[in-house]
Amino acid sequence: MTRYALAVDVGGTKMEAALVAEDGRLLPGSRSRQPTGRDATFESLDAAVVTIVEHALAALPADAELVGAGIGSAGPVDRSLGAIMPVNMPLARGFVLEEAVRAAASTVLGGDVRTVLGHDGGALALAESWLGATQGAGASLSIVVSTGVGGGFVANGAYIPGATGNAGHLGQVRREGGLTLEEIASGPASAAWAQEQGWTGATGEDLARDAAAGDPLARAAIERSAREVGEALADAATLVDLDVVAIGGGFSRVSADYIDLVQQALTASAAHEYSRRTRVVRSGLGDEGPLIGAAALVLR
């Protein structure tokens, strides 16, 4: 009998769900998404949860076992309440996401479904350590650079959630000028900065296109993001002595050399040899990483 986890990933642009087998593979046909966004409310999130959970569980084979539901969400999260406090969805702060997923899954299956909520960066870190780019590392950090910036730590194969489940939330570290890293380096923040300089595009996708075509403002925005991420990672590497950092998320693919730019900034900024040796690599799991990580919360 194949064992599956229901995986749910909630971010500032979309939420997704899929069934993930105990070997980390997504079940074909089980994956779907619904929009979230800055205007997301308790009601809109609850409706989206029901839609994606029903779609995923409709694909569950009759002879399979569902071991539980794992959720990775934009944070901070409050694991004691099963609630989320997402910076990039202000109207959704306090939404009890864990119960929403449990209720939706239990309604479909006719019985209680064990459900675990985690921070999305921590879930990704667990996935990368299990099946991705940080396998075998003694100490690793995995981050997402997308609508937001999040991260999570793994040491010797064990996810380190911290006291409240929010360890690794790199995007909320304040940088020069009082802004958080997320407010400087995320996709939307980078596009907004470029617009302030006179660029006429609107999105991270526009930045990628225009930079590839030689637009200096678009390129400057990408370099600014990578530099800020690299400098923040230098601080993290100095603090916790990292072997490797894996970077995923849509904006990390804004240019072919984004990871190289981050590595250069980390190496230039780190104060000591042990932190300068930290390697920066691209996520080994692509856009499936957050879902695999959410599943790992109940499979691992």
Language-model features, listed with the residues they occupy:
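Glycine-rich phosphate-binding/hydrolytic loop that grips phosphoryl groups
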Residues: 20, 116-129, 257, 261-300
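Adenine-nucleotide phosphate-binding core of ATP-dependent small-molecule kinases
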Residues: 36-64, 189-246, 251-261, 275-290
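Conserved A3 ("GATE") glycine/threonine-rich loop of ANL adenylate-forming enzymes
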Residues: 13-14, 121-123, 147-150
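Glycine/GP-enriched mid-protein hinge/lid loop-to-helix segment characteristic of carbohydrate kinases
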Residues: 2, 6, 18-22, 29-32, ...
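Short secondary-structure boundary segments
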Residues: 73, 145-147, 244, 249-250
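Conserved phosphate-binding loops in N-terminal lobes of ATP-dependent enzymes
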Residues: 2-73
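Residue-level signal for inorganic ion chemistry
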Residues: 9, 17, 71, 190, ...
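Glycine-rich phosphate-binding loop and adjoining helix at the ATP-binding site
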Residues: 42, 46-50, 65-69, 76-139, ...
